């Protein structure tokens, strides 16, 4: 494992960490929270809706006190009473960060805030794929942050060949279930990265829109940077 990442709030920038705790329902502390419009109940979708794109100018990371949300101008704990106001200034409308699975009273009634991503608990991406995309787009900044993986694997193997195979990751075991279909999040501008539609266009044209793989977790445990990843023999 070359790197591991966690994203405490869906649609916000995540954090590169040393270890991750994996469970059957995914990465502990990953995408536990959502960014939501307090009036309509709309969940943030920067890849589809332009008004949510400032989400990628915000960082979320786990501290000993809880989740810390920060911009270039401020930093607040997720339970800070002033956070909703700071987010409204950031986006230009009333919005907030709330826990996935909780309920929210909006102008259209009480709604349950469902998690955005249900495809698979863990997302893996190889350095090989990043390198190949960089070769196809020599003028682009092919940065891992555009693709939001949990695990970056240092391998020259083709990750598409992992689908359907059992995988051992440190103390954990899982099953690679499917290729990762890509959306507009890959091309959106974020801190130190410009908007670049060619990234998604090239993935669609050269990789059938897929970049990375998803895996289900069969046995829980903790993984760390530097752990070995292996697969069952076909």
Regions from the PLM with identified roles:
Residues 1-234:
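Metal-cofactor-dependent catalytic cores
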């Amino acid at each position: 494992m070359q790197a591991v990442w966690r994203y405490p709030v869906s649609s916000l920038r995540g954090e590169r960490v040393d270890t991750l705790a994996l469970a059957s329902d995914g990465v502990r502390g990953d995408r536990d929270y959502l960014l939501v419009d307090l009036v309509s109940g709309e969940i943030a979708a920067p890849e589809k809706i332009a008004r949510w794109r400032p989400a990628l100018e915000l960082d979320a990371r786990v501290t000993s006190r809880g989740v810390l949300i920060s911009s270039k101008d401020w930093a607040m704990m997720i339970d800070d009473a002033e956070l909703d106001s700071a987010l409204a200034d950031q986006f230009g409308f009333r919005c907030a960060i709330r826990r996935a699975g909780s309920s929210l009273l909006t102008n259209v009634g009480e709604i349950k805030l469902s998690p955005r991503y249900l495809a698979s608990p863990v997302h893996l991406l190889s350095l090989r794929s990043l390198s190949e995309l960089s070769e196809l787009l020599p003028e682009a900044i092919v940065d891992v942050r555009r693709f939001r993986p949990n695990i970056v694997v240092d391998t020259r193997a083709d990750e598409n060949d992992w689908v359907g195979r059992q995988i051992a990751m440190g103390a954990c075991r899982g099953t690679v279930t499917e290729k990762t279909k890509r959306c507009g999040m890959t091309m959106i501008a974020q801190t130190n990265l410009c908007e670049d539609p060619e990234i998604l266009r090239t993935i669609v044209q050269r990789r059938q829109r897929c970049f990375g793989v998803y895996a289900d977790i069969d046995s829980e445990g903790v993984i760390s940077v530097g752990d070995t990843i292996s697969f069952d023999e076909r």
